[in-house]
Amino acid sequence: MNCSRDTGDELMAALLAEGINLILPPRDNIAPGDLIIADPQGGARLGGWHEVFNLQLSPEVATDPGFKSFQFRASSILQVGVAASVMGRVLQALGLGSGSFSSAFSSSNADTIQLSIVAPANKELTNFDAVLVQMNEAKAEPAQGYTDRNFFVVTKVWRARGIRISVADKSKKQVDLSAKAVEELTAKAKMELKREDTGSYAFLAASQLIFGLTLREVTYKDGAIVDVAPTGPLKFRGKGPGDPFAFIGDDAFVDLPES
């Protein structure tokens, strides 16, 4: 199932506003300053500066444990079928399971579900412009075989502990999940489903996992490495002059193989 950014949902809109690419499959080996290499056929993989430009760079990273730039963490109130599909993809991105969750809610008189992110945090590359200067001072250019590729610098790594769901019936009253629903959700998520004191339920990982990346595109043009807006099939969103974000493809998820 593809998950378009343009869903009308508030959580997806917040991810869009932050320029977040949700990442598949989940892993814990991506850091701010890393490089993603995209080929003309639309594939993408994690690479390295030394591999492409024969340089060793020194990225500076700051941690924002308060996630202060991300103002909205809850989804719209979604119909069960829609929410179950989105939930499956989000859990997959967090490495907490996959598949359709629609049938799990049928035994609980569930009509709507609201999703939220648990314990979000990020790490940010703070010297992006200085990295570009360093590359150009070294007269860096792509090695043979990389001249037709697109390059994306990871400027932020977004992490979360899991997702929280709040379930309501047709009268908008919060309801508990049935034992059957808990059993099925636990099996599909491959982890414990915890009921919280508020009546919500949380899928929690043992530690914070990467669920998204913010990217900036760089290219080699006229003898220099420059930061540019993507073209062609790539999606571009800018918050203002000098602050562009790069999206890879129409899907909200970036399929980025381990190797």
UniProtKB/Swiss-Prot annotation:
Palmitoylation helps stabilize the inactive state; may self palmitoylate. Palmitoylation plays a significant role in pore formation. The chain crosses the membrane at residues 70-86, 98-116, 162-179, 187-203. A lipid is attached at C3 (S-palmitoyl cysteine). Keywords: Antiviral defense, Cell inner membrane, Cell membrane, Cytoplasm, Lipoprotein, Membrane, Palmitate, Transmembrane, Transmembrane beta strand. Signal peptide: none annotated. The keyword Lipoprotein applies. One of its GO terms (cellular component) is plasma membrane. One of its GO terms (biological process) is defense response to virus. Residues 244-259 are annotated as: C-terminal region. The N-terminus has marked structural similarity to the mammalian gasdermin N-terminal domain. The C-terminal region wraps around the twisted beta sheet core, probably stabilizing the inactive state. The beta-stranded transmembrane 'fingers' of the active protein form by local refolding of several alpha helices found only in the inactive state. Reorientation of the N-terminus probably flips the palmitoyl moiety for insertion into the membrane. Belongs to the bacterial gasdermin family. This is Gasdermin bGSDM. It comes from Bradyrhizobium tropiciagri.
